[in-house]
């Protein structure tokens, strides 16, 4: 069974082209190394770029998608596995359950919310969060924290 890496990142289209390229390259590297990628399931922003990188290298990809994203047609169409959940909080729970490690890519408020929840639960000893955590510090994004 492949090791699953949960990647938390942005679906916003208001990210720099260099960050999109970095996300795509990261997805490619994960696929080349044989990791299964679990992420938020979007086809846009750095989420979409990550998925593109994974899929171009014939990697496997699980998208955990809240119903609101289905309605807005933001879903990556070529997912290996698609999990639809009612709410954003359910998405976080599934991402934590399905991942063997967590990577926090530069993102916005949603990513910060996910970081806070994972680290809080990890500090409390929650079983689904007692996994390695990596902050992908692209261009020093996480340095102030």
Question: Which role does the model predict for each range below?
Answer:
Residues 1, 31, 74-77, 94-97, ...:
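Solvent-exposed alpha-helices and their adjacent loops that cap or buttress functional pockets
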Residues 45-105, 137, 141:
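Acidic/glycine-enriched connector segments
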Residues 65, 105, 119-145:
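Short, acidic/small-residue loops that bind anionic groups at enzyme active sites
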Residues 1-60:
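Glycine-rich beta-alpha loop segments
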Residues 18, 86, 98-101, 111, ...:
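N-terminal alpha/beta PP-like core and its mobile active-site loop of ThDP/TPP-dependent enzymes
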Residues 48-53, 113-126:
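Short Gly/Thr/Asp-enriched flexible loops that form oxyanion-binding sites at enzyme active sites
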Residues 36-39, 100-110:
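A short, small-residue-rich loop immediately preceding and capping a beta-strand
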Residues 10-13, 67-69, 107-110:
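Short glycine-rich anion-binding loops that position phosphate/pyrophosphate groups of nucleotides
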């Amino acid at each position: 069974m492949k090791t699953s890496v949960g990647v938390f990142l942005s679906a916003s289209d208001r990210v720099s082209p260099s960050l999109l390229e970095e996300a795509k390259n990261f997805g490619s590297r994960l696929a080349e190394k044989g990791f299964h990628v679990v992420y938020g399931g979007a086809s846009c922003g750095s989420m979409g770029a990550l998925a593109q990188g994974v899929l171009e290298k014939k990697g496997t990809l699980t998208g955990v998608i809240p119903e609101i994203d289905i309605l807005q047609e933001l879903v990556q169409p070529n997912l290996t596995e698609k999990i639809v959940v009612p709410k954003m909080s359910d998405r976080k729970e599934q991402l934590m359950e399905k991942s063997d490690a967590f990577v926090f890519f530069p993102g916005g408020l949603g990513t910060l919310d996910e970081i806070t929840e994972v680290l809080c639960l990890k500090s409390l000893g929650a079983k689904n969060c007692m996994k390695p955590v990596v902050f992908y510090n692209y261009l020093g994004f996480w340095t102030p924290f």
